[in-house]
Amino acid sequence: MALSYYKETLRETALKLATPGKGILAVDESTNTCGKRLASIGVENTEENRQAYRGMLFTTEGLGNYISGAILFEETLFQDHADGESMISKLEKEGIIPGIKVDKGLKPLVGALEHETYCSGLDGLTERASDYYARGARFAKWRAVLQITADGPSDLAIRENAWGLARYARSVQEAGLVPIIEPEILMDGDHDILTTSEIQEKIIKEVYFACQQNGVYLEGTLLKPSMTVPGADYEGKSDPKNVALATVTTLLRSVPAAVPGIVFLSGGLSEEEASLYLNEMNLLSADKPWNLSFSYGRACLLYTSDAADEGFC
């Protein structure tokens, strides 16, 4: 099997992505989402302008001192910089590992609750992953979404999304890509932090059970979970120390020690909240078997306000 051939490389790549003090930059926004960011500074959403935006970002001086990997949209993976050099090459010169978003988006999950979804894109995934590997990608990302409600998430939604994440992980490992496993829990709702912790533990355990059934090589994976926070409409205020303790406790109960790194998504959190919570997690004295870091995309917005002054327009 191809997985046997790539095992050592997968482990090494996962460890590099989980380098302490560095995080993963999520720049896998779709063409439409990128267009909204460009529109905020009065720039038309064209391929040339998207190329310039990403090129500016990837050539930021010192980016590789803080970023270990970058998750790209397919257009970016096959795109060249304005100077003719590939975007992949620009990242590699900074010591940043290129990655690729491989899922095809969320679809309604028939038989589940009305709002519940599954993530599409498994058909032909290994073949696509092989093409991405040939272009220079070395890791992948797949996002499943679940929501806490009065009667959810349903067992069907948990099982289906866990199975999809595991099938994706094994499929891309067959092509040499490290899978980032992302079971996002939306912040919608008025539930407390204990409810989030209990449901998140259940979801993550189901994900790793499915990974075991599919023969996923855990040492060659990363987890990208939500932080363990109360619902956005919960009346109480989230204390960073409480969030940190709840998150680490939940993960210690559900994530195997074989996984080298956990990189958090920011979800509905502000930049300040996401940073404070992560900092508190790393200050905890608990023995954590994995490196804890970030995989945020919102920081990209910090570059846009000065884009015109930098000759972007």
Report residues per predicted region:
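Short, well-ordered coil/turn segments that N-cap beta-strands
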Residues: 19-23, 63-68, 94-98, 136-138, ...
